[in-house]
Amino acid sequence: MSATSTATSTSASQLHLNSTPVTHCLSDIVKKEDWSDFKFAPIRESTVSRAMTSRYFKDLDKFAVSDVIIVGAGSSGLSAAYVIAKNRPDLKVCIIESSVAPGGGSWLGGQLFSAMVMRKPAHLFLQELEIPYEDEGDYVVVKHAALFISTVLSKVLQLPNVKLFNATCVEDLVTRPPTEKGEVTVAGVVTNWTLVTQAHGTQCCMDPNVIELAGYKNDGTRDLSQKHGVILSTTGHDGPFGAFCAKRIVDIDQNQKLGGMKGLDMNHAEHDVVIHSGAYAGVDNMYFAGMEVAELDGLNRMGPTFGAMALSGVHAAEQILKHFAA
C-alpha cells in the first residue's frame, strides 16, 4: 500500500452489516469450511437433455389448447397474467414472448435510466406484489425498474397454471367464420421460434405450430358446453413485433382501422390506455392492453411513466375474469 493511499486494512472479524457479523454467504447452506473435497452429485449429459425436452414437450402438449393466450410478456401482459392466473387457478394461461428475456421495456426507466415512476393509484399494485417504493405524493418511485418486472415475472411463473414460451413469436392468428353479428372470431395463435420467423426470407418454407383456444370440438365447431378461450395481446408499439395482433386484425377485417399512436402526453395517455384496454369491438374473444392499445385506437404515448402499463393489464384481466365468470 502506498504512503498516499487512504485505504484502511480491516480484518474480517471487524466487518458488520446491520450490527450482524458478516459470515460466508453459503455457510448456512453448504456448511463446508474446507472446500477441497467439494463435489456435485453425478449426472449424465443425456439426463440433462431428457429433463429439459420431456418437460418442454409436456408443456407444449398441455397448453396446445389454452383458456387464455397472452401475446407479449411485458409489464402489461405479465400484470394481466398475474391477476388472471391467481384468481382462476383452473384456467390454463399461456404466455408467448418473442424475446429470450421476458419483460419488454420495463427493465429500465426512461432513456435507459434505472428508476421507475408510477402515478397513483398504480402503487396499489406494487403493494399487492410487495415491491418497495418511495412515496412522492402523486407518484411513487421504484428504485430500479428491474425490481418491478423481475418480481411480477417471478410471481407469475410460480403459479401452477401458467406457462411462458419465450423466444417464441406469434406469426398469425387462427380464425373461424364470422359470428352472426359479422365479428371476426379468433380461435388461437400461430407460433414459431423467433429466430425461425426472422429467417423466413433466407430459407424455404418453415411451417409454424398452433396453440388453440378452448371451446371447440374435434371437428373444429364450437363446443357450447365450454367457455370460449380468449387472446390478450400486449405486444407494445415498437420493435420487430410491435402492435402485431392489432395490425393483423386490420389486415384480416377491412372494417377495422389502425388508429396509429399519437405524440407523448402523459396526463391523457395513461388514462386513455387504461380505459381503452380490454375487449375489442368487432373481434370476438380478442383483448388488448398496454401500448398496443395506443397504436390500435390512436391514443397518445405516455413515455417513461409506467402506471398505465400495469393497470391496463389489470383492467383487461378483470374483463377476462368477467368473461369466464358469466
UniProtKB/Swiss-Prot annotation:
The keyword Transferase applies. Induction: Repressed by thiamine. Coiled coil: none annotated. GO terms for cellular component: cytosol; nucleus. Keywords: Cytoplasm, Iron, Metal-binding, NAD, Nucleus, Thiamine biosynthesis, Transferase. It holds the Pfam family Thi4. SUPFAM superfamilies: FAD/NAD(P)-binding domain. GO terms for molecular function: cysteine-dependent adenosine diphosphate thiazole synthase activity; ferrous iron binding; iron ion binding. GO terms for biological process: mitochondrial genome maintenance; thiamine biosynthetic process; thiazole biosynthetic process. Binds 1 Fe cation per subunit. It is found in: Cytoplasm; Nucleus. It catalyses: [ADP-thiazole synthase]-L-cysteine + glycine + NAD(+) = [ADP-thiazole synthase]-dehydroalanine + ADP-5-ethyl-4-methylthiazole-2-carboxylate + nicotinamide + 3 H2O + 2 H(+). Its EC number is 2.4.2.60. Substrate binds at residues 76, 97-98, 105, 170, 207, 237, 291, 301-303. InterPro entries: FAD/NAD-bd_sf, Sti35, Thi4_fam. Its main location: cytoplasm. The modification 2,3-didehydroalanine (Cys) is found at residue 205. Involved in biosynthesis of the thiamine precursor thiazole. Catalyzes the conversion of NAD and glycine to adenosine diphosphate 5-(2-hydroxyethyl)-4-methylthiazole-2-carboxylic acid (ADT), an adenylated thiazole intermediate. The reaction includes an iron-dependent sulfide transfer from a conserved cysteine residue of the protein to a thiazole intermediate. The enzyme can only undergo a single turnover, which suggests it is a suicide enzyme. May have additional roles in adaptation to various stress conditions and in DNA damage tolerance. HAMAP family: THI4. Homooctamer; tetramer of dimers. Expressed at high levels in the early stationary phase of batch cultures growing on molasses, an industrial medium. Belongs to the THI4 family. This is Thiamine thiazole synthase. It comes from Saccharomyces cerevisiae (strain ATCC 204508 / S288c).
